[in-house]
Amino acid sequence: MSKDVFTAVGVGADVGRVLGRLSRVVARKSTLPSLSCVKLWVDDSGSDLWAAASSLDQWYEAKLPVELQDGHPGAGCLVRIDLLSSLLAQCNGDGVEMVSADGRISLNAQGRKATIQTLPISEFPTGPAAGDPAAIGEVDGSAIAAALDRVAFAVSKDETRYILNGALFNEDGDAVVATDGRRLALAKVELPECLRDVVLPTPSLGVFSDLWSRSGFCKVFAADSGIGVRGDDEMVWTKKIEGRYPNYKQVIPAYEDFAELKMDREVFEESLRWVAAVGNATEKERGRTATLQVEGAALRVSARAVEVGESEERVPLSDPPQGAMQVAASMDFLREMSHAAGEESLVLRVDPGPDGKVSSPIVCEAEGGRFIGIVMPMRVA
């Protein structure tokens, strides 16, 4: 019997949905044809059809929602995942039959037919090892996913500082951290031993977060210089970023004498969106800066772009601080930090200094310190 022979029947949209998740780890620019493919194979029980995608640095496998009608254990093939996903998406929810044999896979769906050439299953890279049983822990996936989502905005995009191109699961086992040197975000969450002092790379953040949020309590394991997560009928794995993460604790100021700016979070974010209409009209970074100035019981939020114009809005403050105060910072950084804080009321802590011009970090705390956001200010003209 040919090694690629199997027949399976399922709903095109359901199968396509699973392949859509797997496609997030496919290597887009690889010269290896196999890495642009999805691996389809019959599992050892001979009763289920599985699929896997890989970029060598990442691996994602899942059981497909199909009924296997024919196929012996190990039978399988490689198919271009973009083409297969596109065809399945056009099955309009109708049942689709997938038949693999003789270097081709055929799709039959309510009169629609297509045949795609396949590659031998042997050309696909080997998946990660199962890992040391002692290095396996159980986590509350939804809690970790929520923490990751809150800090992801602060991950560095500067590839020359590779250690910052991901989120840190801290050594203390109680927080997820991300920073790009100009801002920092920390979210408290309980971590198992195998996740401590691990930097999860940026390409894997969304994939892991999605699986964690859908799986609830699930297994995490360390294997092959990487980290993996096992959910219900699926598994994702990624290489870790090797290196020493900067001491982020030194960046978090412990202000003894500080001023608090308390306001409605959504109103503040709306004001930033308003001034961004002018600020974002220029390519210069200075034009994308928001200036925050305390004026009585309100916070004046403004932006000015040379040769473009200026905009402002006043945001009411509850219990406004005494005296004049002014600080400038990236409007995007402020808005993202505010959104991650999540609470109805936003509190920003600043050290105004003797002249009222803030030059030290802007600190945002929410949920009793379970979220901390920091934005470095810009020089006030």
Regions found by a protein language model. Give the residues of each.
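Structural preference for solvent-exposed beta-strand-turn elements
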Residues: 1-381
